[in-house]
């Protein structure tokens, strides 16, 4: 099939999106944005800020020694896409059950950035539950809040809170901004957590995940040719041993590349973008939807001939393989 209808486009600009909440895809692990792709051009690298504790925030028995009180150290946290500082909160009250049964209270940072205690439903026995919103279990906390600790009591008699009553296991009792670990997928405009986020907020939803990002805008590269996607190659090496051979395989990711005729080789737009990480979109037939997406750092090698227009040989150094798209 002839490639005379082929077209190569490059990322010539972006559509920016300010810090806003991402949407849970439904599995509590993949969060979608409003963009199809995430740019990584200069000044446009995605910034992802899941709600959660960053530094400080230790919850300890009140230094005053007063019954039913805890102290919360000053802290920083991601809150609605902003890094917030929260002042120390001393002598914060914990409400015990009215009888000698188990009760769990969550120490939280509200959406307004202040400390608040959210009490769970009292048990009917001295047994605690790990199920949210159950009798004797931790509460579902408000959407937009951050849980930093739980305080567990099993008696109704006023007494100092002890260290043994305070629970701060990350992922169970404490929501951190850096847990679970996440990766950003520029080729799908999504954020992926390595484990599903706990559904501990009202309505059975996860903590909120915020991000700012930019979606690439594409422009056709005129007079381009010889596009090569970034693809993985495989090789085999062998070692001779007694009675036979042991083989091992290895893989490597090759550079993408293309060539183009230039106007003057100096003011051409593609030359102005050299050394940036850009998206490139290749259509084998510009009248059809299938295309190849490649994101990588643009390298250029210019040739200035005596009688011809300047030419450029471009490389695309990618972190991942090019992606084949049907539409």
Named regions from a protein language model:
Residues 3-215:
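Beta-strand-rich solenoidal segments
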Residues 73-79, 101-108, 243-266:
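Beta-rich globular "head" domains
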Residues 93-101, 199-200, 245-250, 269-272, ...:
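Exposed beta-sheet edge/beta-hairpin loop segments within beta-rich domains
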Residues 105-108, 259-295:
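Short, acidic/charged, Gly/Pro-enriched secondary-structure junctions
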Residues 106, 150, 255-259, 279, ...:
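Beta-strand secondary-structure signal
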Residues 110, 261-263, 317-321:
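Solvent-exposed residues in well-ordered beta-strands and their adjoining turns
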Residues 207-259, 295-309:
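Solvent-exposed edge beta-strands and adjacent loop segments
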Residues 281-326:
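Short beta-strand and beta-hairpin "edge-sheet" elements
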């Amino acid at each position: 099939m002839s490639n005379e209808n082929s077209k190569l486009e490059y990322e010539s600009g972006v559509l920016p999106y300010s810090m806003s909440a991402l949407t849970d895809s439904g599995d509590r692990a993949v969060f979608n944005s409003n963009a199809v792709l995430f740019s990584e051009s200069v000044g446009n690298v995605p910034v992802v800020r899941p709600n959660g504790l960053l530094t400080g925030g230790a919850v300890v028995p009140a230094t005053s020694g007063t019954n039913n009180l805890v102290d919360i150290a000053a802290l920083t946290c991601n809150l609605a896409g902003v890094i917030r500082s929260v002042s120390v909160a001393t002598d914060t009250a914990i409400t015990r059950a009215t009888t000698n049964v188990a009760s769990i209270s969550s120490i939280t940072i509200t959406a307004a950035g202040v400390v608040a205690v959210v009490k769970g439903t009292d048990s009917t026995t001295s047994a605690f539950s790990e199920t949210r919103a159950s009798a004797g279990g931790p509460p579902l906390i408000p959407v937009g809040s951050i849980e930093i600790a739980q305080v567990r009591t099993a008696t109704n008699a006023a007494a100092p809170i002890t260290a043994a009553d305070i629970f701060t296991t990350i992922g169970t009792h404490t929501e951190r901004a850096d847990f679970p670990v996440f990766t950003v997928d520029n080729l799908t405009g999504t954020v992926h957590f390595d484990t599903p986020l706990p559904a501990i907020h009202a309505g059975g939803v996860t903590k909120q995940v915020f991000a700012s990002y930019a979606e690439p805008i594409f422009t056709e590269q005129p007079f381009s040719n010889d596009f090569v996607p970034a693809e993985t190659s495989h090789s085999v090496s062998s070692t001779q041993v007694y009675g036979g051979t042991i083989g091992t395989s290895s893989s490597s990711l090759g550079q993408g590349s293309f060539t183009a005729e230039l106007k003057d080789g100096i003011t051409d737009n593609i030359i102005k973008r050299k050394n940036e990480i850009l998206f490139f979109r290749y259509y084998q037939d510009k009248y059809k939807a299938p295309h190849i997406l490649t994101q990588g750092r643009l390298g250029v090698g210019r040739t200035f001939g005596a009688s011809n227009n300047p030419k450029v040989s471009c490389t695309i150094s990618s972190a991942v393989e090019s992606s084949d798209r049907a539409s």
